[in-house]
Curated annotation (Swiss-Prot):
Chain intervals for the UniProt region annotation (Disordered): 272-314, 577-614
Function: Component of the acetyl coenzyme A carboxylase (ACC) complex. Biotin carboxylase (BC) catalyzes the carboxylation of biotin on its carrier protein (BCCP) and then the CO(2) group is transferred by the transcarboxylase to acetyl-CoA to form malonyl-CoA.
Listed name of the protein: Acetyl-coenzyme A carboxylase carboxyl transferase subunits beta/alpha
Gene Ontology BP terms: fatty acid biosynthetic process; malonyl-CoA biosynthetic process
Originating species: Parafrankia sp. (strain EAN1pec)
GO molecular function terms listed in the Swiss-Prot or TrEMBL record: acetyl-CoA carboxylase activity; ATP binding; carboxyl- or carbamoyltransferase activity; zinc ion binding
Length: 614
């Protein structure tokens, strides 16, 4: 691929009829108004298709565009003829569109953020995926890899190009592995799904990116609705395969109207490309990373500059049931309340990419005091309506899988993870069990233990059992002063062991669910102060205290390299329940010995793949 000599912004072909009829609402629209609005109906919001040139002009900063020449591969490998020779169809498409193929590759910037983009054009044989398109998409990936620049794919396709036979099919694998190389290199990839995106494109590079953005009403799928209805006679629901349907079912991350695409994409690119720097570290207490109290750990102090209480004697000695009552108050700030006050450039990501978007779990990217972070948390609500809509803050298996997906993105991009926990526990019930609730929780525990980035967890309200722990395998585990954290709810424990749910206060005391007891036991590393009367009395003060605690914890962890972070985190949890010699420390975790060398040209990954295959 070579860059064209021109660096001028492509002229958008805004020529249109004086008046036209909207395909969405069938109303008459003044053509120039329609063009000025990005080809979006001002009456109903219907988004018309754009050419690749129009799309590039819409998205990239003026003066930043450098179109990359893409070589045209074998034009007609099968000498294919149906009602018309394929070679004739190619010539006609090139003449009518002015393009050599169904994709345009360019470098540029979006609100100052560098990006490599590949933009498909549906006018060219329905945006079908053939060898030339596959080569262009792969070439764009290779440019992004070589220049370590985020990749933006704008898709519009009816599927594979049948006239190229199995060669077209191979482009799915070719482009998929190119995306995989960007994953390995830690480079952000984003898809913008436009209408329509189907077949081989949908089942390869379009849906393999880190973030999937869709325009309103855009359709995405493997088999089209007509194919499904005709082959298996299945009745499909209204809105099937639209962006809105797919958002509800966890396939796309967000829907962005065309007028908001540039700021939406710029937020994503900005967070992903400006990595957090190191920060001054609070002097440690001399312990090594191996016991989970490495550099920057200040749990021996009563207070740090972050305001976190680390000495249980400085916390009020009260009955734990008081904390239970305060932790459950509906007025307490929720995860989204804290995010709204603390996180700049917030972009929420949706869905587990499988079937669901659990409303009880929120996750996304943003900045905390300028530091790019990933924030994940359970969300309850403040009213009965909100609680019901959010499943009472009890995540489904899909919620935990959504959290895991975003944690993996954090690991890929090298971003710290913050989790905010306020849940009575994982959602119980038939559907949760059918979908593998236990497996989802277990997989999160394993995943978090090995994340190569700083992880800070805060129990802000209720920390209920494994459903809370699935977000709390962290380098620093904090809790708010009036939060609780327990293996079971006090009422549940009372019902089982006391045979009387009314014995909840007794169970709370026996379980030691309060911050003072948990800090003394080392379950949490520090306690975030709350205003007198609770966080709901003065949410601003509670937010300020949480900000100080989070920024302090991240500053402590920022200088640590990935192996140290992982070793320290594993050591932290390794020591729980481990008998220690009198006056001595708990056993250090076992560090695997170096693997023996392999033959020339082979890697351990090759060996592992071979074992799995066998």
């Amino acid at each position: 691929m070579t860059a064209s000599a021109t660096r001028q912004r492509p002229e958008a072909d805004l020529g249109t009829a004086e008046w036209l009829v909207c395909d969405g609402c069938r109303r008459m629209i003044y053509g120039r108004r329609f063009a000025r609005g990005g080809h979006v109906c001002p009456e109903c919001g219907w988004h018309a298709r754009l050419t690749a040139t129009q799309r590039i002009a819409l998205l990239l900063d003026e003066g930043s565009v450098e179109v990359v020449d893409t070589p045209v591969t074998a034009a007609d490998p099968l000498q294919f003829v149906d009602t018309r020779p394929y070679a004739d169809r190619l010539r006609s498409a090139r003449t009518s569109t002015g393009l050599t193929e169904a994709v345009v590759v360019a470098r540029g910037r979006i609100e100052g953020c560098p990006v490599v983009t590949a933009v498909m054009d549906f006018r060219f044989l329905g945006g079908s995926l053939g060898a030339a398109v596959g080569e262009a998409i792969t070439g764009a990936c290779e440019i992004a890899l070589r220049e370590r620049t985020p990749l933006l794919l704008v898709t519009a396709s009816g599927g594979a190009r049948m006239q190229e036979g199995a060669l077209s099919l191979m482009q799915m694998a070719k482009t998929a592995q190119a995306i995989g190389q960007l994953d390995e290199a830690g480079i952000l990839t984003v898809s913008l799904i436009t209408d329509p995106t189907f077949g081989g494109v949908a089942a390869s590079f379009a849906t393999l990116t880190d973030v999937i953005v869709a325009e309103p009403g855009a359709r995405l799928g493997f088999a089209g609705a007509r194919v499904i209805e005709q082959t298996i006679r299945q009745t499909l629901p209204p809105g099937f395969q639209t962006a809105e349907f797919l958002l509800e079912h966890g396939v796309v991350d967000l829907i962005s109207p065309r007028g908001q695409l540039r700021p939406t994409l710029a937020r994503l690119l900005g967070v992903a490309t400006r990595r957090p720097g190191t920060a001054p570290v609070t002097p440690g207490d001399g312990h090594s990373a191996g016991d989970g109290r490495g550099a920057g750990d200040s749990r021996g102090a009563s207070h740090g500059g972050d305001g976190v209480v680390r000495d249980p004697a400085r916390l009020a000695d009260r009955h734990p049931w008081e904390a239970v009552r305060l932790a459950r108050r509906l007025g307490r700030p929720s995860t989204l309340d804290y995010i709204g006050a603390l996180v700049e450039d917030w972009t929420e990501l949706h869905g587990d990419r499988a079937a669901t978007d659990c409303p009880a779990m929120v996750a996304g990217l943003g900045r905390l005091d300028g530091t790019p972070v990933v924030v994940i948390g359970t969300q309850k609500g403040h009213t009965a309506t909100e609680l019901a809509a959010r499943s009472y803050g009890m995540p489904s298996p899909g919620g935990y899988r959504k959290a895991a997906r975003v944690m993996r993105l954090a690991a890929k991009l090298g971003l710290p993870v913050i989790t905010l926990i306020d849940t009575a526990g994982a959602h119980p019930g038939l559907e949760a069990e059918q979908n593998g609730q236990a497996v989802a929780i277990a997989e999160n525990l394993r995943l978090m233990a090995g994340l190569p980035v700083p992880v800070v967890a805060v129990v802000t309200g209720e920390g209920g059992s494994g459903g809370a722990l699935a977000l709390a395998v962290a380098n620093r585990v904090l809790m708010c002063a009036n939060a609780i954290y327990s293996v079971i709810s006090p009422e549940g424990c009372a019902a089982i062991l006391w045979k009387d749910p009314a014995a909840g206060p007794d169970a709370a005391a026996a379980l030691r669910v309060d911050a003072r007891a948990l800090l003394a036991a080392g379950i949490v590393d520090g306690v975030v102060p709350e205003p007198d009367g609770g966080a709901d009395v003065d949410p601003l003060a509670a937010t300020d205290a949480l900000r100080a605690a989070l920024t302090g914890a991240l500053a402590e962890l920022a200088p640590l390299d990935p192996p140290t972070l992982v070793t320290a985190r594993r050591a932290r949890f390794r020591r729980f329940g481990t008998p220690a010699p009198a006056g001595g420390a708990a056993p250090a975790p076992v560090v695997p010995a170096a693997r023996p060398p392999l033959g020339a040209g082979r890697t351990h990954a090759d060996l592992d793949d071979a074992r799995r295959a066998s």
